[in-house]
């Protein structure tokens, strides 16, 4: 004679189902890629125009993911002199690269290390009338000191926040506008239009934290 304890079997089945559900949930948790903190030195963003003439020259396109200058459409930001473009929105001039991505940006007021999250409500793309990173002394990332020094210096406590061309995020702190990032730059003797900057790249889609 075989006796079957139905209640005991139901308990065991429920326990098995709960175990399988837990294992399934654990397996479904995404494995996040590590956040990357990088330093870029001596990135040249030269103009070809003479002083007093309208700016000309190619924009230098940069990829946060690839950690280097790129030639294709997979760029996130682009530099020429003090101007920084994002790969999203519309061009303001014919000599700018086409915007093919969904990049955006804004200038955050706060020390680089204290900016731990992206405020998505502040993100803007480039347009025909304005850039996501404002141009002009005191408006975006730099001050122009004028005569007699004519120095261009990063504004302390300004952090650039970017959405990349494919929807990831990065924050950037510009350290210097002069070659080799001299502690006391001289606009007459140090080579200008050469960037040194730090950046932190969040490679995981939909994650807005830099922690």
Regions flagged by a language model, labelled:
Residues 1-9:
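N-terminal secretory signal peptides that target proteins for export/translocation
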Residues 10-18:
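Sec-dependent signal peptide recognition
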Residues 21-24:
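C-terminal motif of bacterial Sec signal peptides marking the signal peptidase cleavage site
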Residues 26-158, 180-184, 190-211:
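N-terminal "domain-start" segment
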Residues 160-164:
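A short beta-strand micro-motif
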Residues 165-169:
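Glycine-centered tight beta-turn/hairpin loop motif at sheet-sheet or coil-to-beta transitions
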């Amino acid at each position: 004679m075989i006796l079957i304890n139905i209640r005991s079997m139901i308990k065991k089945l429920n326990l098995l189902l709960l175990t399988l559900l837990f294992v399934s949930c654990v397996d479904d948790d995404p494995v996040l890629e590590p956040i990357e903190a990088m330093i870029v030195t001596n990135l040249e963003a030269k103009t070809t125009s003479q002083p007093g003439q309208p700016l000309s020259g190619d924009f230098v396109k940069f990829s946060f993911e690839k950690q280097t200058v790129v030639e294709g459409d997979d760029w996130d930001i682009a530099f020429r002199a003090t101007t920084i473009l994002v790969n999203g929105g519309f061009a303001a001039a014919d000599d700018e690269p086409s915007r093919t991505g969904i990049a955006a940006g804004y200038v955050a007021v706060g020390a680089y290390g204290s900016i731990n999250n992206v405020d998505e409500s502040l993100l803007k793309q480039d347009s025909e009338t304005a850039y996501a990173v404002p141009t002009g002394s005191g408006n975006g990332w730099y001050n122009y000191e004028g005569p007699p020094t004519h120095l261009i210096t990063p504004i302390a406590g300004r952090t650039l926040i970017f959405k990349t061309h494919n929807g990831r995020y990065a924050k950037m702190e510009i350290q210097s506008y002069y070659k080799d990032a001299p502690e006391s730059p001289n606009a007459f003797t140090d080579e200008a239009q050469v960037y040194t900057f730090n950046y932190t790249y969040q490679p995981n889609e939909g994650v807005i934290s830099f922690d």
